[in-house]
Amino acid sequence: MKNLFNFFKTSSELRLAYRLLKQINQKRSFYGAMTDFDLANQTNIFKKRLANGEKLKDIRVDAFAVAREATKRILGKTPYDVQILGGLILDMGSVAEMKTGEGKTIASIPPVYLNALLGQGVIVSTVNEYLAERDAEDNGKVYNFLGLTVGINKTEMDANTKRMMYNADITYSVHSELGFDYLRDNMVFSAAEKVQRGLNFCLIDEVDSILIDEAKTPLIISGGKTNLPAQYLSANQFVNTLIAEDFYIDEETKGIKLNDKGIDKANAFFGLRNLYEIQNSEIVHRIQNALRANKVMKRDVEYIVQDGKIALVDQFTGRIMAGRSYSEGLQQALQAKEGLEIEPETKTLATITYQNFFRLFKKLSGMTGTAKTEEQEFIDVYNMRVNVIPTNKPMIRKDERDEIFATSHEKNQAIISEVERVHKRGQPILIGTSQVVDSETLSEMLNQKGLYHTVLNAKQNQLEAEIIAKAGRKNAITIATNMAGRGTDIILEPGVTELGGLYILGTDKAEARRIDNQLRGRSGRQGDVGISRFFISLQDQLFRRFTNFDQIFGAYGQTNGAIKGKYIHAVLLAAQKKIEGFNFDMRKTVLSYDDVIRQQRDLIYAQRDILLQIENFDHYIQKMIIRAVDIILNYDFIILPNQEIHYKNLINFLNDNLSRITHFNFGQIGIENYPIEQLNEFLIKQLETIYFKQIQSVLKENLGKTYFESERYIILSTLDSQWQNHIDTIDKLRSSANLVQYSQKNPYQIFTEEATKKFNILVAESAYQAIVSLFNNSNAEKIEYIKAILSDGTAISYPADSPQEIIDQIIASNEERIAAARKAKEEKQPEFIEKQLAKLKIEKVESGEEFELWKIGDSKLVNLKKEMPLDEKQNILVKMQQEQLEMMSEEEKNLIQEQNLEIVEIEEIEEEIQNENPQKVEFVDFKNDPDAYNKLIFGADYADKQLISSEEEDNNEKTNINNNEDLERTKGEAQQTAKNPNE
C-alpha cells in the first residue's frame, strides 16, 4: 500500500522516466559489446535517423544508453540509475532536484548529448567560470569521443573566438555572459557580427540560484556617461542632516521615503516650493538614492569597499559580483556616502532580466540540490516542473533542531563553545554565514581562542573551490558564506567518517529554506555520515523584519541560554515562509514590469534582425517618409491652433533639415498652393522624388552596389539611439512609479500606459530621425575629382576639396610604390634574362674562374668572359643563335623557328612580364617592325643601345626580315590549320 501511495505521489514525468530507465538498462549489454569505433559511430547513425524525419524522443533510449557506455569507458564512471533518471527529467524540460554529491554533472551528459545531435547547439549554463571550465574539460572528453565539439565561452574573449565557441555542438558558459552576448548581438550592424546562433536548448546548473535568487537582477549594458558629482554630493549632504523622525523605513521591503517633516526639510534645503512637482523628479531621484545608500544599505553586507571602489556582494552566495555596479545613480550615491571618487553615471543602452532571457530558449531545463520549495514559481514563470530524484544511497546525515538565543552576543558565544567542543575530537566543521561582517566577527572570536581556521567571504574568494574542498579534513575549521563553493564536492579525509563526518553549523536563517538546505547538503553526500545545526538569535534580520519583533523580544528577550518550546520555532518557520512569499511576489512584480519592456524589446530586436538581412530599403524609406511628414505637419509652429498652415515656417524647417546635401529649395515648388488636406500627400511625393531620384542615385554612384549598407547603418543607428533613450526613460519611469500613489491609481497600470505611449513616440521619432539622417547622408554628396599623372605614366584621382597636405601624401605614397616596383624589377632582371635565354634553348653548361661555357641549341658552344655584364652576354648569345639559324637548311630553320615562336608567343611573353613586373607592356609588332624580336629580348629601348656594330646591324636586320617572313608563313599555316583541323 505504501509503494502504491508513493507511486501516485510521483509526478507523471518521473513515472515516464522510470519506464525509460528500464528500457535503457536493457540496452546496456548491446552497446557494452561494441568496439570504441562502433560506439562512437552511433552519433552518425542517430544524426541520419533525425535527418530522415525521426524525433529526439524516437532515439532517446538508444542515445542515453550510448552516452552511459561512453561515460563509463572515457571517465571510468558508470552513471547510476538515479543519474540516468535525472538526465531523463532534464531532457523533458524540467528541473531535476538532486542532492549534493549525487553527481549532477554526470547526470547532465546523456541529455546534453541527445539534444546536441540536432546540430542546433546546446548551452550548459553555470554559476562561475571555474565550473564551466571544469565541466567542459571533464564531460568534453565524452562528447569528443562521440564525435561532438565542445566550446567554453569566457568574458574576455573577442567576438571571433566567441562565435567559434557558440558554433560548437555544446557550449559551456557563465549565465551572465550568455545574457550579455545576447544584448550585444542586438547592437551589431551586420548579421555576420553576431556571436550566438539560435537559442535552442539550455541546461542550467544550480538553476534555483540563477532563475530564482538572481531573477530580479537585470543585465545592463551601459554607456553615454554623464558626470554631475555635485548633484550626488548635495543629495548626500542633505540626507546626512536628517534624523530618524524625518523618514520612514519598511523593514520587510527595505523601502524608504521621506515623511512630511523630511519633505519640508528638502524644500528648505533645495529652495523648492513643492518637492514632488514633476520638474523636480531628478532631485527626488537623487534624494531617494542617497536615502537608500545611507539609511538602508550596509557596508560589508550589500557591498564592500575594495581598492577605493564599491564592489557588490551577492546576497545569496556571498561572492563579489565582479564587473557589476548599481544602476540609475545608486552606485554614485554609495560613492558619495563612502567619500570615494564619484564616477560618471552611465546610460542604459540595453537590458534584460534573467527571467526573460532564459525564457527565449525553445527548450529549458535545470538541475540543483534544492528547488522543490519553489516549484510553483518554476511552473508559473518558466513552465518547468520540479522532480525530486531519489538518492543513490540512503541519507544518514542528522539534521539537529535549531538553537535559538535572545541576543546576537549569546548566539556567538554558543557558536564558539560548540566549535571548541567539536574541534577537540578532530571533527571538521563548516560554519556558514550570510554576511561578511558576521564571518569577520566569528573569525576574530576564534582567533582569541587560538583556534586556527580558514575564512572564505567576499573579501577572500580567489581560491573558493580549493578552500571548500579542504573543509572535509580532520581538525579543519572553515568559515564561509552559505553558498560559497557551490558545485564543489567536499571529500571526507580518511578517518573523518568515524568522527561523525562533516559538521555544518549555520549562524542564521536565510530568506529561503532552500538556501538553508543547500548549506545542510554540504554534509552527508553519497550516504556519508554528517550533522547539521543552526544557531539563531531573535536579533537576526529574519526576526526583525518578518515577525512582531517587539512582542517576541518582550516575551523571550531576557532568556538565558537557548530558548525552549515549539512556539518560537513555529514563529521562525512562519517568518521564513512569509519572506519566501514576499520575495516571490517581488519577482513577479519585476517580471510583470519587465514583460512590458520585453514585448517592446522583442519588436525592436525582430525589426533589427529584418534590417540586418535585407538589401533593399526602398519600401522602409517610403514608410518612414510618410511617418516623418505626419510628424512635421503636427508641429505647433507649422500647424497653428486655428488649423492654418504657417507656410514660411514649414519651408524654412524643410530647407534647414532636409536640404543640406541636395541644396533643394522647398520655397520654389509651390507649397503655398496646397491646403492642409492636400499638403500631406504633396510633401510625401516631393520627398520620395528628392530621395530616390537625387540622393540615392548619387549614393549609388559614390558607393556602388553596396550603397544600401550606408542606408542600413543610418536606419539601425537611429533606431538604436531612440531605443536606448526609451529604455533609459522607462527605467526612471519605473523607479518613480510610487509618485503616482496619491492619484488613487494602480502604479503598474500607470506604468503600462505611459510605457506604451512612449513606445509609440519612439517608433514615430525613429522614422523621422532616420529620414533627416538619410537626407543629410554625407555619402550622398557629389564629389569632384582631380586627376594627377605619376612618374610611370599612370593616373590617380583625388577629391577636389582635399587639403594640399593630404594630396601630397597620396602622391608621395604612390611614387614610393612605383620606386619600389622599379627596384624589384632591377633585382629580378638577371633571373628574367636567364629565364628567357633558357626558353630560347641557350644555357650555361660550365663556369670556370675567368670564362663561362654557354650552349646554343643542341650543338654550338661558346666561351664568354665571366665578368661580362649579363645583358651583353645575352646580346651576343642571341645574335650567334640567329647566325646559326641562317646556316641551317630551310627545313631545319623552319622547325627551330616554329619551336622558338612557340616559346616567344607574344601573349605568353606579355603575361610573363606582367607577372614579373606589374607595369604596362607595349605590344611588339613582328609584322611591321624589323627590330621587334630584339626589342622583345633586349627591351623597348633597344634602338638607343649600341650593342653591336653597324655592319652587324645590317646582317641582323636581314635576319629579322627573314624571321618575320617565316613568322608570317607560320601564322598563316596556323590559321589555315585552325580552319581545317582534320588537315
Curated annotation (Swiss-Prot):
This is Protein translocase subunit SecA. It catalyses: ATP + H2O + cellular proteinSide 1 = ADP + phosphate + cellular proteinSide 2. InterPro entries: Helicase_ATP-bd, Helicase_C-like, P-loop_NTPase, SecA, SecA_CS, SecA_DEAD, SecA_motor_DEAD, SecA_preprotein_X-link_dom. Residues 948-983 are annotated as: Disordered. It is a peripheral membrane protein. HAMAP family: SecA. Monomer and homodimer. Part of the essential Sec protein translocation apparatus which comprises SecA, SecYEG and auxiliary proteins SecDF. Other proteins may also be involved. Part of the Sec protein translocase complex. Interacts with the SecYEG preprotein conducting channel. Has a central role in coupling the hydrolysis of ATP to the transfer of proteins into and across the cell membrane, serving as an ATP-driven molecular motor driving the stepwise translocation of polypeptide chains across the membrane.
